[in-house]
Swiss-Prot record:
Entry function: Involved in the regulation of the perinuclear actin network and nuclear shape through interaction with filamins. Plays an essential role in the formation of cartilaginous skeletal elements.
Annotated Pro residues bias: 28-38
Basic and acidic residues: bias regions: 12-21
The protein's name in its UniProt record: Refilin-A
Length: 204
């Protein structure tokens, strides 16, 4: 009996064995090319680049943190302001009245003073609390009494020895600058009638 036997797997086995014979060192032929891509040698610079591009290592837990920069902040705690008022310098009030006659002179001057409050000092204090918008203000005004002439009176008693027909009175008031002066004049004339009349004053 004559027949044919078909072995499908035999062809593949034969090809594999043929490739194996070609790749074996006993065949005397050079090795077949590898299906893997060719290997190219990397330069040292390329290796360094690849090394540096690797993921950075996780920071150590025991690494000391950088010192925090501490800056002190200046906040207003107390603020004071004072204003000093320099009043006018003290004036010496002198009121002199002088009457000059050809005879004796006699003077009686009266000056009345009264304390008048005058601003002598002024101060203001502002207190600011830190980290707060609260403010405290305090103002102080100092008043001190200073004498001031309110009324001036002068009386002159005359004992004439040599009677004259005209008299003049001058009053000088020195209240600082400028000075003030006042003058008054009195003129007398003889009366034939000894009885007092409207034209003859009985009291000087």
């Amino acid at each position: 009996m004559v027949g044919h036997l078909h072995l499908q797997a035999m062809g593949d086995t034969r090809e594999q064995s043929r490739d194996g014979l070609l790749d074996s060192p006993d065949s005397g032929l050079p090795p077949s090319p590898s299906p893997s891509p060719p290997f190219y040698a990397l330069s040292p610079g390329t290796l360094d680049t690849r090394t540096t591009t690797e993921a950075p290592a996780a920071p150590s837990l025991f690494q000391t943190p950088p010192a925090l920069e501490m800056r002190s902040r200046l906040l207003p705690v107390f603020f004071g302001e004072s204003i000093e008022v320099d009043p006018e310098p003290a004036h010496e009030i002198r009121c002199n009245s002088e009457i000059t006659y050809a005879s004796e002179r006699y003077f009686r001057d009266k000056i009345f003073y009264a304390p008048v409050p005058t601003v002598t000092a002024y101060s203001e204090t502002i207190v600011a609390a830190p980290n707060c918008t609260w403010r405290s203000y305090r103002s102080q005004l100092t008043l001190e009494p200073r004498p001031r002439a309110l009324r001036f009176g002068s009386t002159a008693i005359i004992f004439p020895k040599l009677a004259r027909s005209s008299f003049r009175t001058t009053l000088h008031c020195s209240l600082g600058q400028p000075r003030h002066w006042y003058s008054s004049s009195l003129q007398l004339r003889r009366c034939g009638d000894p009885t007092p009349g409207p034209s003859c004053p009985d009291v000087l």
